Amino acid sequence: IQSTSMDQGILTEDSMNSFIRTLIQAGIWKNKVPKQMARTKDGTQTTVKKSEAEADATASQDTRLGFQPIVSVDAELLRQQRRFSSPRVLLSENTPLEPPPLYLTEEPVALNRTSRRKREGKSHRGEYSVCDSESRWVTDKSSAVDIRGHQVTVLGEIRMGPS
């Protein structure tokens, strides 16, 4: 799922919960594919569920090798979820050309003096990126320096629910 900054509407809590439920049902939330496609002798495709032990063994092997899976979202799921929009997140099939802007433009466009006074200087939009100390955009990193200068660990997977 790619996120970019776009003003497309307000996202209600109920619609977000519904969307998260859809992601969990699709097996995307935990970076797992619940079913795997297999071909039979006559060439037709069938779905085969992986056993839980087999899935855990694969996950632990991937963790030892330092592999962090990239979640791939089916284009059909994105088309179904177009109504879920927010000013900060956009579900898209395309990879963004550049990272989202972290600050508003320095020069206000509006002629209204009240608005201009409010926007003087850089105002922070509340968007945070994972970046290193040289302020370069980082896409695949396991540790980083946060906005306060502290060394932090970037999680490859977030586990939810009881362990």
Swiss-Prot record:
The keyword Secreted applies. Keywords: Cleavage on pair of basic residues, Glycoprotein, Growth factor, Secreted, Signal. The keyword Glycoprotein applies. Residues 1-3 form the signal peptide. GO terms for molecular function: growth factor activity; nerve growth factor receptor binding. Glycans are attached at residue 112. Its main location: secreted. PROSITE patterns: NGF_2. Residues 38-60, 90-131 are annotated as: Disordered. GO terms for biological process: cell surface receptor protein tyrosine kinase signaling pathway; modulation of chemical synaptic transmission; negative regulation of neuron apoptotic process; nerve development; nerve growth factor signaling pathway; neuron projection morphogenesis. GO terms for cellular component: axon; dendrite; extracellular space; synaptic vesicle. Residues 4-119 form a propeptide. It is found in: Secreted. It holds the Pfam family NGF. Belongs to the NGF-beta family. Seems to promote the survival of visceral and proprioceptive sensory neurons. This is Neurotrophin-3. It comes from Eunectes notaeus (Yellow anaconda). The lineage of its organism: Eukaryota, Metazoa, Chordata, Craniata, Vertebrata.
